Amino acid sequence: MGTLDHAVGKRYFLTGKFPRGLSASGSSMSTWWANENPGLFTIPNLVIRTEMYNEGLDPRASGLRIQGYEDLSTVLKPLNPDLEPRAELAKALAEVQYSQGCLEKQLDVTTRVTAHRASFEKALAFGGGSVWEYFNFKRNPAPGSSVANVYEAFGINPGNPFSQLGSSGGRAAIAAQALTNGLTQAVSVGVAGGLDTHGDEWAADQVSRQREGWTAIANFIKYMKNTLDPNGKPYWDRMSIVASSDFARTPRINTRGGRDHFLYSGVLIAGAGIKGNQVVGQTRNIDYHGEPIDHSTGKPDEMGAHIRPPDVHATLLEGAGLSYKNVSNQSPVLMQTALKS
């Protein structure tokens, strides 16, 4: 990853560009993905317990950032009818929002008006309450309903779902519900946390917390493979997924019984256009540092190069049939061995 700093490692992978100090450079991959057609979805870009960046793209592609289910309910639950403007007032407000006077044109040089109007449109959609119905995770939903299916897939107790909606599985369930109901085209999820185990808590906490996160990812993939879209095809057939961390932990145990930050890490990519069931690259047997590889074969090659975040971005986007111009100035190298022919 080229860094041992949490913020730098996270933002480097989110955008595919090395940060400017601690500040992200460029836009998140999910924002580029949503920018393909931001007007098509109610929530083009859903961001759950992680970061998101938009540098110069359509403001509608910016993520709806939430920490968890409680935030989602706050944003999407319908307004109190007593607080909604009367018809005449609502009409007048809309006319003001979309007026095209000289002031609006001057302000929009920096896209402020465009961004404000995009937010206004989303506020209208969210305030009506129709989107909330997809996330109204009630107790004991009707058998066979989408909510009941999500509970079963992610191991959520239907009798008391609220105790688990803040877990890794709960966050993955929210992502699955958004994607399979046509509400969004890009979701970023902070699946696991509490992994910065420098002390002897490593032995107990690292395994259980990673297992919870990986189980959520596995259940998500399984659910997408088993759930059909309106055309009768699995959602997984047109989906891509990437799982990463800020960096890895050192192979050696430190003097406190934990593991420190490590410069090399791994990443999971899967889905549309990706040739799975393989490991690309390897680490050295002596110090476990990453070895340079031939990107066309995935095999170690002293004349090759290390895999970098922009290479991962480019490969995943290429597999999905999308442009990877977002990292074109990073000289990305496609991992040809990871792409379906």
What are these regions (language model features)?
Residues 2-134:
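A contiguous, mid-domain pocket- or channel-lining segment that forms the substrate-recognition surface
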Residues 3-7, 37-41, 167-171, 178-183, ...:
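Extracellular/periplasmic catalytic domains that process cell-envelope and extracellular macromolecules
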Residues 12-14, 42-49, 185-190, 240-243, ...:
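Structural recognition of the beta-strand scaffold that forms the well-ordered cores
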Residues 16, 20, 56-62, 148, ...:
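Surface-exposed intrinsically disordered loops and tails
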Residues 26, 30, 168, 309-313:
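A structural signal for well-ordered alpha-helical scaffolds and beta->alpha junctions
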Residues 34, 38, 77-80, 179-180, ...:
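Hydrophobic/aromatic-lined pockets within catalytic cores
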Residues 100-230:
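Anion-binding catalytic surfaces of enzymes that hydrolyze or transfer phosphate/sulfate esters
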Residues 194-341:
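Feature marks hydrolase-like catalytic cores characterized by long aromatic- and Gly/Pro-rich stretches
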